[in-house]
């Protein structure tokens, strides 16, 4: 039994001796110093005045802004809905950072409603993964004037 174990151990050691471990960063932006919004407006003939603020996920360590943000724009725009993707700061121990960024996004979208041809009373929020947590936090804990309509 000892010999089988030793043989198996050395066989595995030999097989993995050439294995190289390479550290990779998770996809998406890191160390966002300044939050930002990217606005995707529908064609004027399709526009309904409705908008959705999208909060991408990423486990509060990075943002998956492409597949959980920007890639949704054509879907919403074809339905006449503006999509506004929020790049929020990572908390790094301060949970108020992403919350304040999302609250500011809601205020900016409402304040810019005339410029973007939006109805300030028809602004929603959505998110994926950690972004979904952020969206639900804004929907339930923000001051009433900063909460989404849906």
Question: What is each of the regions a protein language model found here?
Answer:
Residues 51, 77-87, 124:
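A fold-wide structural signal in alpha/beta-hydrolase
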Residues 64-71, 86-120:
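Catalytic nucleophile-loop/oxyanion-hole region of alpha/beta-hydrolase
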Residues 1-24:
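Bacterial Sec-dependent N-terminal signal peptides
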């Amino acid at each position: 039994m000892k010999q089988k174990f030793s043989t198996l151990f050395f066989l595995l050691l030999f097989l993995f001796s050439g294995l190289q471990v390479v550290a990779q960063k998770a996809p998406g932006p890191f160390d966002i110093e300044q939050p930002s919004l990217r606005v995707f407006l529908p064609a004027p003939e399709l526009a309904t005045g409705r908008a959705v603020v999208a909060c991408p996920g990423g486990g509060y360590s990075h943002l998956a802004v492409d597949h959980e943000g920007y890639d949704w724009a054509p879907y919403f725009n074809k339905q006449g809905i503006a999509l506004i993707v929020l790049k929020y700061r990572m908390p790094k121990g301060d949970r108020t950072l992403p919350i304040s960024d999302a609250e500011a996004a809601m205020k900016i979208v409402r304040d810019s409603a005339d410029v973007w041809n939006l109805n300030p009373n028809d602004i929603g929020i959505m998110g994926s993964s950690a972004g979904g947590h952020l969206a639900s936090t804004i929907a339930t804990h923000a001051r009433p004037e900063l909460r989404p309509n849906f």
